[in-house]
Amino acid sequence: MNLLLAYGGTTDWKLPPDVRVTCCGESTAAIAAGLRPDTEVLVTDALPPANTSAPGLRWIHLMSAGYNQAIGHPLALRAGMRVSNAAGICAGPMAEFVVGQMLRHVKRFDDFARLQSGRTWPGRMAMATPPLRGRRALIVGYGGVGRETARLLTAMGVVVDAIQRTTDRQRYAGYLPQPGMGDAEGLLPARIFPTERLDEALASADFVILTIPLTPRTRHLLNGPTLAAMKPCAVIINVARGGLIDATALIAALDSGRVGHAYLDVFEPEPLAADSPLWAHPSITVTPHMSGVMPDAAVQQEGLLRQNLVRCQAGEPLLNEIAPVRLKG
C-alpha cells in the first residue's frame, strides 16, 4: 500500500510493514506534487487543488478533528473514496481546556490576577465566588470532545445537555486514546436536543460549549437570533471552528449584555487579524487555537493511523470514517 504523508512533525512512525510511506510538505501545491498515480492513501490536513487527478487514491485520512476542508472537494466526493479524520485524538486536552475556562470564569481568576497586579487585598466576601456545581452546560456537538467534556463536567456536578443530529442516545464508535474516556453509551446528558431545537436548549444554559464540526449547515450556528435566545449573561466557549459564530452578531450581543462572556480559541480566518475588534473586547478572551495542542500529538496520530491501516487492509470500517453524505455539504 502506497501512502503519502503530508505532515510537518516526526515521520518515524511504526506502520504495518507493507505500507510504503512517502513524505511531502503540507501545502496544497506540495501535496499535489507528491501524489503519484499509484498513491492509495493520503494522510494530510490540507487537500490538494480540486483539479488534482490521483487516479489510485482510495482513502484520505485528515489529521484534524473536523472535516470542513473535505466538504465538496472533488477527491473526497469521488465514488468509492473513503475519508476519515482524527476526531478524538485531542479529546482529553480540549475537554480540560473547556473545564479550565469555565473554572476561570466562575472562580474569577482574571480578577484575582488584576488584584495581585494592583497589590490589592479586598474583603473576602467582596470576592466570593459561586460553585460550578449545579450550573447547566449545553454541549453543541456530542462527539469525542463533547463526550469527554461531559464526563469531566458531570463529575464536578454540572448538569449537561447536548445537541446532536438526533435525540437517540447513541453509542460512540469513534476513536479515543484511552479506555474510560468520554461517554461511550451517550447516557450522561440530562437532555438531548436535535439541532432544530437549538433555541430551546440555549434558553436554560449557563455555558454554551461548541464542539460541533463546521459544515454549510452549522456555519454561523450562533447568529443574531440564536444569540438572542440564550439565557441572559450566559458564557460561550468555542473550541471547534471560528465559522460557527457570526462574530459581528456576537460583539453586538456582548455589548448589549445579552451574552456574558465569550472564550474563543478558534477564529475565521486564522491567525486572527491584528486589527480585529475581538482582541480588545472586554468580554472576549482570545486564545490562539491551542486547546488541542499537546506534546504527544504525533504519537496519537500514529496510533490512530496504524489502527485504521489494519482495518483498511482487512476490509473493516475505519475509525472516524465520515459518511459520504456529510461530505456533500
Could you describe each region identified by the protein language model?
Residues 1-41, 171, 177-178, 329:
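N-terminal glycine-/charge-rich "phosphate-binding" loop or analogous flexible N-terminal tail
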Residues 233, 239-329:
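Rossmann-like dinucleotide-binding domain for NAD(H)/NADP(H)
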Residues 113-148, 188:
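Glycine-rich NAD(P)-binding loop of Rossmann-like domains
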Residues 37-116, 129-130:
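Phosphate/diphosphate ligand-binding glycine-rich loop within oxidoreductases
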Residues 95-114, 154-158, 303-316:
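Oxidoreductase and adenylate-handling cofactor-binding alpha/beta cores
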